[in-house]
């Protein structure tokens, strides 16, 4: 793979987002929790001190840009590879160029975009070269490194969390592009009204790259008015981004209204309506992974034990999206939505857990009954811990009829009332049979 270009002198054909990449920390907008004056990271960057790191954050938050800025201060070459399009061959080629740089006395930053998409063996391939100083490793990921990256790689790189840019940050990015006479639209007869700037910032959900792409598209499409200026009106934004996209506000009320409509449609067993609201969310620029997470919650809250497979379907859709990307992944989430909408419904587990939580919070902290206590030591056994515990597998039907697992003060408590729908109907029959065994058992824990 070729080196990252750090030369902005010939930018005629570069997109606005590429032209406006910050060249130093002063131009970098956002991430003040990491880059504010006096923080350790900017001090290290400005001193040219390199260390391997993982940049974790949503799209458009400046992960690639920060890597480039670091390279500028360190006077280092940058090798960039993408885990989506690169394999072992590209890794070896990048490492070889880094080795040549080291032999020539130059430093190399290896920037790996979407590093979470590399498998364990591919991630391991970087370790010896990090260890011997051939490369300074910078990985960018939108996924939680704790789950997606090897512990060996994490132990050699510091993780920095980059947050979605605020609406004010995005407005500052847009203002910077409008005022910059070298890389942006400064000095040109292009006008960005405050209301349009705010609308773009609210539309892009903290994604600076998307904001600049939107601004560039508007500048290209705007017509010259009678005064010779191109005014980027909100109506043009609506045409470009879609009316529904432009309606998302900063607080997300519109977005959460759509999510609520989707959830209620699934709960109401209305697959067609659920698909409609899902499509509305997608076309409005909503995050499909947020919908995938909501599907997982629905599978537990509204389907529950009526169809335990619902949770597996929701997890599979989420996993599919992360593996294959938006085009195919959005269809997988749609499949999960239809499955959930058509599945038998039960909130029995949800309501049971709420009731148990209420008791745990509001009632006294009753002692654990002696027969249920752990007895790992001789002293505990002498104190009676675990005595008279009935091992269910030694009982008829693997059930200790008449046994009670509650404290005596709440021995008759019941939280879970299964419905008669789906698999939960069978669960209800099983629990009714067990209750009958308890009633008929001559052995009772509490009398």
Swiss-Prot record:
Domain of life, source organism: Bacteria
GO molecular function: ATP binding; ATP hydrolysis activity; ATP-dependent activity, acting on DNA; DNA binding; enzyme activator activity; identical protein binding; single-stranded DNA helicase activity
Annotated GO CC locations: replisome
Keyword ATP-binding carried by entry: yes
Annotated phenotype, changing residue 156 to A: Lack of ATPase activity
Coiled-coil portions: none
Single GO BP term: DNA recombination
Disruption phenotype: Mutation gives no obvious mutant phenotype, but, when combined with xer or dif mutants, leads to slower growth.
Pfam families: AAA, AAA_assoc_2, MgsA_C
SUPFAM superfamilies named among the record's database cross-references: P-loop containing nucleoside triphosphate hydrolases, post-AAA+ oligomerization domain-like
Keyword ATP-binding among record annotations: yes
Binding annotation for ATP: 57-64
Keyword annotations: ATP-binding, DNA replication, Nucleotide-binding
Domain free text: Contains an N-terminal ATP-binding domain, an adjacent helical lid domain, and a C-terminal tetramerization domain.
Family according to the record: Belongs to the AAA ATPase family. RarA/MGS1/WRNIP1 subfamily.
Subunit note: Homotetramer. Interacts with the single-stranded DNA-binding protein (ssb).
Role noted for this protein: DNA-dependent ATPase that plays important roles in cellular responses to stalled DNA replication processes.
Note: Overexpression causes an increase in mutation frequency and inhibits growth of recA mutant.
Protein name: Replication-associated recombination protein A
Organism: Escherichia coli (strain K12)
